[in-house]
Curated annotation (Swiss-Prot):
PROSITE patterns reported for this sequence: RF_PROK_I
Family per similarity comment: Belongs to the prokaryotic/mitochondrial release factor family.
Pfam families: RF-1
The protein's name: Putative peptide chain release factor homolog
SUPFAM superfamilies for this protein: Release factor (SSF75620)
Domain of life: Bacteria
Gene3D superfamilies: 3.30.160.20, 3.30.70.1660
Entry's Gene Ontology molecular function annotations: translation release factor activity
Gene: prfH
Length: 166
């Protein structure tokens, strides 16, 4: 279990994120995706008249971008003030992260080595920002899934507190 969101009552879950892997993981998830109906009076709301409860099960693929550390550096002349030093040395650096295509240009320092170090730090920061954005988008997609549960037309039906399929 990768992530859980606790329910309103003790020992309940509002949401759970489970990871499956192996040869039959896709087929197993396919057999469960959709609406699951549970027919049973609620143990948490005994006087409630409803006995049909619906659960939504969906498949979400993780964004598994393997980020390599391969960075291509290009040196070029800086622009702006600096006199003869700027005009004669290639101290500016354009760094490109090969896996993601993120590119930065750094010319704030006088030395090429210092600019390379800053470029590496900038790329690392941008990669972290990109990963956080992707994670937030996936979390938002899972949150919206809660509101899209189809009540009716269940893929599987279970009855009773023992959760017996039938």
């Amino acid at each position: 279990m990768l992530e859980t969101e606790t329910g309103r009552y003790s020992d309940t879950l509002r949401s759970a994120l489970v990871s499956l892997d192996g040869d039959n993981a896709w087929a197993l998830s396919e057999s469960w995706c959709g609406t699951i109906q549970w027919i049973c009076p609620s143990p948490y709301r005994p006087h409630h008249g409803r006995k049909n409860w619906f659960l939504g099960i969906g498949r979400f693929t993780a964004d598994e971008q393997e980020q390599s550390d391969a960075i291509r550096y290009e040196t070029l002349r800086s622009s702006g003030p600096g006199g003869q030093h700027v005009n004669k040395t290639d101290s500016a650096v354009r760094a490109t992260h090969l896996a993601s295509g993120i590119s930065v240009k750094v010319q704030s320092e006088r030395s090429q080595h210092a600019n390379k170090r800053l470029a590496r730090l900038l790329i690392a920061w941008k990669l972290e920002q990109q990963q956080q954005e992707n994670s937030a988008a996936l979390k938002s997609q899972r949150r919206m899934f809660h509101h899209q549960i189809e009540r009716g037309n269940p893929r599987r039906t279970f009855t009773g507190m023992a959760f017996i399929e039938g």
